[in-house]
């Protein structure tokens, strides 16, 4: 059985695809997806005044997911937040948990949230972290191609194809990544 390391081009193709994604701004999938604040503009504005929420966002931006999850958890335990504000915080907490490799906690947090492309993506990342590659691949199919998260989904799909040693899926995914701009 051939492994991907014996192919002549996939490493170069993966590298070029990563460069394309980074050239798109290097933003995290959370930044690419429409925020919950689009649904609750006033709540989002009020929430931006919350120190723990600000610290959580800053920690995520600085790639400190464990610290971010702590800030978001403290923010959620606050008595003076409206339920609509807590609904804005929960996806950030779930993302931070997955990023911090607290996979089970993160998957449980996402399970409590309504279906969305962001939920599908982060659930797939969590399943990938657990080594459940086939289940992760299934979750990615729920992300529409028109959604900004689809680029991140394709990147993850390429990694999954590599782990599954599915050359055809890898080639298809890399081809779609090359066409996406």
Regions found by a protein language model. Give the residues of each.
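Alpha-helical solenoid scaffolds that mediate protein-protein interactions
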Residues: 75-76, 113-114, 143, 177
């Amino acid at each position: 059985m051939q492994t991907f390391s014996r192919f002549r081009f996939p490493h170069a193709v993966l590298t070029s695809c990563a460069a394309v994604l980074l050239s798109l701004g290097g933003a995290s999938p959370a930044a690419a997806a429409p925020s919950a604040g689009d649904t609750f503009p006033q709540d989002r504005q009020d929430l931006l005044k919350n120190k723990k929420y600000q610290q959580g966002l800053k920690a995520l931006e600085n790639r400190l997911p464990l610290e971010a999850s702590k800030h978001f958890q403290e923010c959620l335990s606050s008595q003076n937040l409206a339920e609509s504000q807590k609904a804005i915080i929960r996806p950030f907490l779930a993302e931070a948990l997955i990023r911090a490799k607290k996979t089970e906690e993160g998957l449980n947090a996402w399970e409590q949230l309504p279906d969305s492309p962001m939920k599908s993506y982060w659930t797939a990342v969590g399943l990938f972290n657990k080594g459940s590659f086939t289940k992760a691949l299934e979750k990615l199919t729920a992300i529409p191609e028109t959604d900004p998260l689809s680029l991140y989904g394709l990147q993850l799909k390429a990694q999954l194809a590599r782990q599954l040693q599915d050359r055809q899926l890898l080639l298809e995914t890399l081809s779609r990544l090359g066409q996406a701009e």
